[in-house]
Amino acid sequence: MSQAISLTFPDGSVRGYDAGATGRDVAESISKSLAKKAVAVAIDGTVRDLSDPVTTGRIEIITRNDDRALELIRHDAAHVMAEAVQELWPGTQVTIGPVIENGFYYDFAKNEPFTLDDLPKIEKKMKEIIARNAAFTKQVWSRDRAKQVFADKGEQYKVELVDAIPEGQDLKIYYQGDWFDLCRGPHMASTGQIGSAFKLLKVAGAYWRGDSNNPMLSRIYGTAFAEQSELDNYLHMLAEAEKRDHRRLGREMDLFHFQEEGPGVVFWHGKGWRVFQTLVAYMRRRLAGDYQEVNAPQVLDKSLWETSGHWGWYRDSMFKVTVAGDDTDDDRVFALKPMNCPGHIQIFKHGLKSYRELPIRLAEFGNVHRYEPSGALHGLMRVRGFTQDDAHIFCTDEQMAAECLKINDLILSVYKDFGFDEVTIKLSTRPDKRVGSDELWDRAESVMMGVLETIQQQSNNIKTGILPGEGAFYGPKFEYTLKDAIGREWQCGTTQVDFNLPERFGAFYIDSNSEKTQPVMIHRAICGSMERFLGILIENFAGHMPLWVSPLQVVVATITSEADAYGLEVAEALREAGLNVETDFRNEKINYKIREHSVTKVPVIIVCGRKEAEERTVNIRRLGSQDQVSMGLDAAVESLALEATPPDIRRKAEARKAKAA
């Protein structure tokens, strides 16, 4: 056969291969050891089965230690789990089983739902199947054959999935031994390549197709890794996350609660609202001088949302509002705002704007409402009503880069104040479906790429990346992702350039040539959802909040009633210094008091007895420590007041002191 295929390898070398050569053939042509390690190939970046014929292009041989192999390991583990379930419980229907972040799941139609007690049995059977080391082989079936085979097996959900596959698209069937499933692929070479580093984690109910009108299925979640050490680290992280669950800590610290009458909306208790307001006050100070804080209505006529495009793009996630009474002269349909941006454009449009006034930066701590399915709600992390620390900058095209850099500096500074030093910034570029001309996108992406390069040069510890095709339909965006104390990543901040809304609403300013010109609109959020950010803080610190954020900073506890008067004096001195203080003069043993306040995560407990009252000292005990530090009252007040000062205020004070010197 002639050498009809040309392959370019990662080192730049080019080799020719016969037409029909597979990925495995290519790996074997390099070395037998590589062929043994290979699990898949990538042609021009697309991962494919080793058994697939290769085509001319850039080729990479993927082994288990390649990052891309992890998805294959998890995908194959999901298939093996499905086979194990059907071996253990014949007649169970398999439906869908995708790879998800940090693992995989599979939904099953079974008369009785799975329980946690079933998971060890399934894991044992999975190990047996993996040990068989059956090859993954692929067949392409006709639509009629696929429907007939699955119908004969009693797999009605698979028949429905076959019907949903577009005409002209291959129906791929993957075998592992005698067991097979409908699947797009790709897969590794055999079940043995999955390895033993897998774990089934939990069971749950899930509606077929996510529709509550459909039957309830039984879902099993699992995870898998290339190495056992990686699995062990992940399971340790899950255990830590369980201890840090903000919902449990929120109850223990008496911060907030949820109840059935208000699904997805927070009932803030006194202490929780104090933390929330501390966060808002901090953000307000960070915006002072650069932003105008505004407030747009929460309820607006649907016509405005039609103009903005939200009614067409986002209506299923919006709350519609009408007047409840029958005898009303206003039968219009309104909506609770899901976003602040249309309201901010109305404020910008109110009155003629000159180029000399730009940039105009409008900020709002706006209450927004978005419908989330009840099954998706998760404490403060996923709610239906929340507060956005939203801002919109209206600027000229020439000002866009400087504004993006200014926003970046603010975002990174805020994160640093809360102890988040590991931040990743990714630029999401144009999606296939978008508004605006290619010329506009070229310009915006060029500017933002330049901003990203500047960020890289200025911040050595900041990771950056590109997310091709992940931009919003109205413009490219930066996404800011934090890494918390146990290694989890949280996407919080965004900076988005918008070509769409200014045009839809006819926003303009008068330029230097006295012409009407459409402004560049930049959306930016730092925390994103303030509620979610607070949930992240609670979990990051495991409830042990920095003193300046803590809702109750100090408890003054006395050993004896003879020290109560002095305890009151200590508490008052701390309050005058600006700290949130409570007293505990109950007739209980001091160790009992300390244990109780430790559960509620009070960061500082000051212990006073007869000796301290006589010497005008205090014993300071920190949350999580068995040690006590004795200090004079005045020194203790000064030290704690400084520690409780927010970092932005402390920086300004230090700058003033340095300037005065």
UniProtKB/Swiss-Prot annotation:
GO terms for molecular function: ATP binding; metal ion binding; threonine-tRNA ligase activity; tRNA binding. NCBIfam families: thrS. InterPro entries: aa-tRNA-synt_IIb (IPR002314), aa-tRNA-synth_II (IPR006195), aa-tRNA-synth_II/BPL/LPL (IPR045864), Anticodon-bd (IPR004154), Anticodon-bd_dom_sf (IPR036621), Beta-grasp_dom_sf (IPR012675), TGS (IPR004095), TGS-like (IPR012676). It is found in: Cytoplasm. Keywords: Aminoacyl-tRNA synthetase, ATP-binding, Cytoplasm, Ligase, Metal-binding, Nucleotide-binding, Protein biosynthesis, RNA-binding, tRNA-binding, Zinc. Zn(2+) binds at residues 341, 392, 523. It catalyses: tRNA(Thr) + L-threonine + ATP = L-threonyl-tRNA(Thr) + AMP + diphosphate + H(+). Residues 1-64 form the TGS domain. This is Threonine--tRNA ligase. Pfam families: HGTP_anticodon, TGS, tRNA-synt_2b, tRNA_SAD. PANTHER family: THREONINE--TRNA LIGASE, CHLOROPLASTIC_MITOCHONDRIAL 2, THREONINE-TRNA LIGASE. Its EC number is 6.1.1.3. Its cofactor is Zn(2+). Homodimer. It comes from Rhizobium johnstonii (strain DSM 114642 / LMG 32736 / 3841) (Rhizobium leguminosarum bv. viciae). Catalyzes the attachment of threonine to tRNA(Thr) in a two-step reaction: L-threonine is first activated by ATP to form Thr-AMP and then transferred to the acceptor end of tRNA(Thr). Also edits incorrectly charged L-seryl-tRNA(Thr). It comes from the Bacteria. Belongs to the class-II aminoacyl-tRNA synthetase family. Binds 1 zinc ion per subunit. GO terms for biological process: threonyl-tRNA aminoacylation. HAMAP family: Thr_tRNA_synth.
